[in-house]
Structures are given as structure tokens and as C-alpha cells.
Amino acid sequence: MGSLSIWHWLIVLLIVALVFGTKKLRNIGTDLGGAVKGFKEGMKEAETPAGEAQQRELPRNGAVDVDAKEKAPRSGDYR
């Protein structure tokens, strides 16, 4: 008596479909599925070893060869 039967759940599902509409429920399902997929991909990226992450860094040579386009003021007023 305390538990809900399959008929109770079908009636609740029918009422929810009537209130929100099937198009909105389909959009919610699609958004939820995309969020779960993104979460799983994020967890896989977090599991990569630290050695692989370090290989993606750019090498640092120490010297950079560039030409300045304009001279910066030395008055301390950097607006």
C-alpha cells in the first residue's frame, strides 16, 4: 500500500508530459545527456598522467626576439 505501482508512475508520466510538452522534455533529455557526456570526458582528461601534460608545454629557450612598436611611459601612470 505504501509503494507506487507501475500504473501510478504511468499516470505521473502522462501528467508531466501534458504539463511540459514532449518537445520540452526531449530538449531536457538531450541537454542532460550532453552534460553527462561532457562530465565523463572531463573525468577521462583528469585521469591522464602528469607526464603527458608536461609534454604539451612549449619549450622555454629564455630569449625572445621581438621589436617594440611604441615605447612605454616610465612615469608609473599605466592607464
From Swiss-Prot:
Signal peptide range: none
| Gene Ontology process terms (BP) | protein transport by the Tat complex
What sections of the protein cross the membrane? Answer: 1-21
Domain of life, per the record?
Bacteria
What are this entry's molecular-function GO terms? protein transmembrane transporter activity
Where is this gene product found? Cell inner membrane
Keyword rRNA processing in record: no
Q: How does it sit in the membrane?
A: Single-pass membrane protein
Per the record, the major location class is membrane
Bias (Basic and acidic residues): 66-79
Record's keyword annotation contains Transport? yes
Q: Where is this region: Disordered?
A: 43-79
Give the matching Pfam families.
TatA_B_E
Keyword terms: Cell inner membrane, Cell membrane, Membrane, Protein transport, Translocation, Transmembrane, Transmembrane helix, Transport
Known NCBIfam families for this protein?
PRK02958.1 (NF002813), tatAE (TIGR01411)
Q: Name the job this protein performs.
A: Part of the twin-arginine translocation (Tat) system that transports large folded proteins containing a characteristic twin-arginine motif in their signal peptide across membranes. TatA could form the protein-conducting channel of the Tat system.
Q: State the family named in the UniProt similarity comment for this chain.
A: Belongs to the TatA/E family.
Q: How does it assemble?
A: The Tat system comprises two distinct complexes: a TatABC complex, containing multiple copies of TatA, TatB and TatC subunits, and a separate TatA complex, containing only TatA subunits. Substrates initially bind to the TatABC complex, which probably triggers association of the separate TatA complex to form the active translocon.
- List the protein's name: Sec-independent protein translocase protein TatA
- Report the source organism: Paraburkholderia xenovorans (strain LB400)
Q: What is the lineage of its organism?
A: Bacteria, Pseudomonadati, Pseudomonadota, Betaproteobacteria, Burkholderiales
